[in-house]
Design a protein with these regions (language model features):
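A general secondary-structure junction signal
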Residues: 41-43, 98-102
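A short beta-turn/loop motif at secondary-structure boundaries
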Residues: 41-47, 87
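Short coil/turn motifs at secondary-structure junctions
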Residues: 11-13, 44, 58-60
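Short, surface-exposed ligand-recognition loops at beta-strand->loop->(often short) alpha-helix junctions
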Residues: 9-20
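Active-site-flanking beta-strand signature of metal-NTP-handling nucleotidyl enzymes
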Residues: 3-8
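Absolute protein N-terminus
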Residues: 1-2, 103
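Residue-level preference for beta-strand/loop junctions
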Residues: 2, 47-49
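An amphipathic, aromatic/His-enriched active-site/gating alpha helix that lines ligand/cofactor pockets
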Residues: 20-38, 54-98
Length: 103
């Protein structure tokens, strides 16, 4: 089992908007069979205005397949695109972390 974590360092005042995007994506993702995503905001972190979204996947092959060919209908994919439109305006930078869950 692996934990895939996307860390977004938002621009000042943009955390709520980015959080809402991740929460909306999670609803669609769960409906279409993707793993449930945990969405977190910082109280104290490496940088202010941090949003973290993470999910557990059984293996990296499954995650890679999910990223290259997401489950769900064409309408779901269009809704994903609509939700994430202009998200770059909310974010300074970000990173992805992948961890093997040992126990």
């Amino acid at each position: 089992m692996f934990l895939v974590r996307d860390v977004m360092y938002c621009k000042p005042g943009k955390v709520r908007a980015m959080t809402e995007k991740f929460l909306a994506m999670n609803k669609i993702g769960e409906r279409s069979g993707m793993p449930k995503m945990r969405v977190m905001t910082d109280l104290c972190a490496e940088r202010y205005w941090t949003v973290v979204a993470e999910m557990e996947v059984p293996d990296l092959t499954a995650w890679q397949q999910m990223m290259s060919n997401p489950p769900g209908s064409e309408a779901d994919m269009k809704e994903f695109e609509k939700i994430m439109k202009d998200y770059h305006d909310l974010v300074d930078t970000g990173k992805r972390e992948i961890y093997k869950i040992e126990g």
